[in-house]
């Protein structure tokens, strides 16, 4: 099994709280396996209830009034002994059983066992999960399990996790991180090797099944088979959406690669229907975001804190949730050309997609780009977490030092920008406010701590 960074956070959670933990995220990001690894590390007994594979298991919670009733019914769905203090019980795919979410508080209060939940955002069932359950079970006293359950979101493997999975030595990762932290060049030999690993990441991506297929076989065709299966799974979920909107969703999903390959990479609404207005299919884009299928990056007119006040929701780029799926959708032998590092390929869309994916995985939440007729366009602007805005430009060619728009906003005194990052194929260097980093270092860009720690008021 693939090791994931989230394992440390999960261990810390179960060591320090009695609450249940729900992992959410897109299909096939590894939520269930994260709990299976946890069970092997910390528990003697593990029980897994999957509400998709075993629909009858929903009866465990339907109409239940207390933990005793729930546990009695649960015992009918497992042949394993439940050992108090030593058992982890996973409720998998809880979007199919919203009552589980609202009633988990009874089980946590009872305290005999520990609980995990997973929910796939691919499907409308999970949206407003607590609200739906409350409507159904008002007489049973259903309510949101505040104080009884925490929620963490999983993403595909980031580049650091991928590098470890394919055998990059930990000391090399440490060297690269040290170079990032101290803004110094990576050893040239290491840099060349990491660029090869990065090009492999572009075609394999970070979804566990394709990554595991590569680790086990080193066969890109096997990787592609896994990617096709995941795309088909996504399309199956889309087909179960509102009948009036599923065709539009399907078309949006299929248009992502070509729209990203366009000159400005912005999603052009007329490609869907010249007669449609944004408001009419805004929910379709929101569904794809909440489902984890796509990453929207909204336009801001000024790079100022808070960015959300300057955003234009009807102007956006739409990236794939995983760069490997994007590369697969381009097809036409592009995998081999990427691996060989052909200089005539337009890597722009793929590079920007991988950066969007990395920023999401590192906790930046909503992403933005800057565009104005007067100053030009900058690929990403993010809130660094320390009260500043950080512009990020992504360059895939030899002209990485040409970035007029970035220079324009750095020179605009009213924006008060003291640093910008240019992600490119080259090694680390600094020119005044501009920091040039190898593209693979996007995995180390973290959001700084926003909330202060201990603060004692002196009166």
How would you name each of these model-derived features?
Residues 1-15:
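Pre-Walker A adenine-sensing motif
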Residues 53-85:
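Short glycine-rich substrate-engagement loop in P-loop NTPases that contacts/grips substrate
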Residues 31:
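Conserved lysine of the Walker
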Residues 211-386:
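Accessory nucleic acid-recognition modules appended to NTPase machines
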Residues 34, 38:
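Hydrophobic positions on the alpha1 helix immediately C-terminal to the Walker A/P-loop
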Residues 114-120, 153:
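Structural recognition of the conserved hydrophobic beta-strand(s) that form the central parallel beta-sheet
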Residues 426-459:
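Domain-level recognition of nuclease-like catalytic cores that cleave nucleotide substrates
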Residues 126-262:
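Interdomain motor-coupling "hinge/lid" segment immediately C-terminal to the ATP-binding subdomain
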């Amino acid at each position: 099994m693939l090791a994931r960074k989230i394992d440390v956070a999960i261990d810390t959670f179960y060591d320090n709280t009695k609450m249940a933990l729900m992992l959410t995220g897109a299909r096939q990001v590894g939520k269930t396996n994260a709990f299976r690894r946890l069970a092997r590390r910390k528990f003697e007994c593990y029980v897994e209830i999957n509400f998709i594979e075993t629909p009858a298991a929903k009866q465990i919670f339907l109409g239940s009034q207390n933990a005793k009733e729930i546990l009695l019914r649960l015992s009918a769905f497992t042949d394993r002994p439940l050992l108090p203090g030593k058992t982890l019980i996973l409720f998998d795919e809880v979007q199919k059983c919203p009552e589980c979410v609202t009633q988990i508080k009874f089980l946590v209060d009872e305290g005999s066992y520990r609980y995990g939940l997973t929910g796939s955002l691919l499907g409308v069932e999970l949206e407003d999960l607590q609200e739906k359950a409350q409507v159904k079970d008002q007489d049973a006293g259903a309510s949101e399990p505040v104080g009884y359950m925490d929620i963490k979101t999983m993403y595909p493997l980031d580049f650091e996790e991928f590098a470890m999975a394919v055998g990059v030595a930990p000391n090399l990762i440490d060297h690269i991180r040290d170079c990032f932290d101290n803004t110094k060049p990576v050893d040239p030999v290491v840099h060349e090797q990491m660029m090869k690993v990065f090009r492999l990441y572009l075609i394999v991506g970070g979804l566990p099944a394709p990554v595991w297929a590569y680790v086990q076989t080193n066969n890109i065709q096997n990787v592609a088979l896994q990617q096709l299966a995941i795309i088909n799974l996504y399309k199956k979920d889309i087909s179960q959406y509102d009948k009036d909107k599923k065709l539009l969703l399907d078309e949006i999903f299929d248009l992502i690669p070509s729209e990203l390959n366009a000159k400005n990479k912005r999603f052009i609404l007329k490609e869907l229907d010249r007669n449609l207005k944004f408001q009419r299919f805004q929910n379709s884009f929101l569904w794809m975001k909440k489902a984890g299928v796509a990453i929207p990056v909204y336009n801001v007119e000024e790079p100022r804190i808070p960015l959300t006040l300057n955003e234009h929701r009807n102007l956006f780029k739409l990236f794939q949730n995983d760069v490997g799926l994007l590369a697969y959708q381009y097809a036409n032998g592009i995998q081999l050309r990427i691996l060989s590092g052909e200089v005539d390929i337009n890597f722009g869309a793929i590079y920007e997609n991988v950066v969007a994916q990395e920023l999401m995985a590192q906790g930046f939440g909503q992403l933005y780009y800057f565009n104005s007729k007067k100053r030009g366009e900058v690929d990403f602007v993010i809130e660094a977490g320390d009260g500043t805005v950080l512009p990020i430009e992504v360059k895939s060619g030899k002209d990485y030092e040409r970035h007029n728009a970035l220079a324009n906003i750095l020179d605009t005194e009213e924006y008060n920008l003291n640093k910008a990052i240019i992600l490119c194929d080259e090694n680390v260097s600094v020119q005044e406010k501009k920091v040039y980093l190898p593209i693979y270092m996007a995995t180390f860009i973290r959001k700084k701590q926003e909330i202060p720690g201990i603060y004692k008021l002196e009166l």
